[in-house]
Amino acid sequence: MKKETYLADPCRASSLPFWKTNSVTVPEGMLILREDDPRLEELSHTHADTPYFKLIHPMQRIARPALPVGYCFKTPNEKILSEHIGACYPSERASASELASYRLHPTYDPDLWLAIQDMETNAVIASGIAELDTDIREGILEWVQVSPVYRRQGFGRIIVCELLSRLHGRADFVTVSGKENDPSSPRSLYENCGFESGVIWHVLKKE
């Protein structure tokens, strides 16, 4: 895909960030179709359908909510992030070695690995990973998670807004994707942080 095509409408052009669009091969037996694709209705009878949203932040206004007293930001390593992701998402895993491979991405930036730590217990209670494609100035939110007992307390918004702040002046826009029907309502979180222009992409796997 050409840069100009992607930049004209990043959410509709691809379900993936630009750098992945041109480097990732869709596995055999899988299709990724946009919500307006006329093939969707027919294929839904023969394929398992998982819808994902893709949103964009125009980076014009970024909130900067303060951390509550007793909490601090820290830079986590892949082991800490792997353990936290596993604790937040029982059905998903990201091994330490898999996360370590992110350091090889052309979009890797160590300043965009972030965690919130409870200063009393030293426990990580929220974390996130973002990346930056300096070629087209696209920021990408890869992982954002909050420990179950700390949800609905604003920590997810703090993580997202802090990552956006660190991307400010370096990224012209930031994209994020997630499961549309996830019970933790990630789309609502991102929209509350200023993301917009949602497009649904359907990941279809042959049954």
Please tell me what each predicted stretch does.
Residues 7-11, 144-152, 180:
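A short, internal acetyl-CoA/4′-phosphopantetheine-binding micro-motif in the GNAT/acyltransferase core
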Residues 19, 40-43, 186-191, 195:
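Conserved active-site tyrosine of GNAT-family acetyltransferases
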Residues 93-146:
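A conserved beta-strand-loop-helix scaffold within acyl/acetyltransferase catalytic domains
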Residues 143-148, 152-168, 187-192:
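Conserved acetyl-CoA-binding loop-helix of GNAT-fold acetyltransferases
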Residues 160, 182-186, 207:
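Short glycine/proline-centered loop/turn elements that form peptide/ligand docking sites
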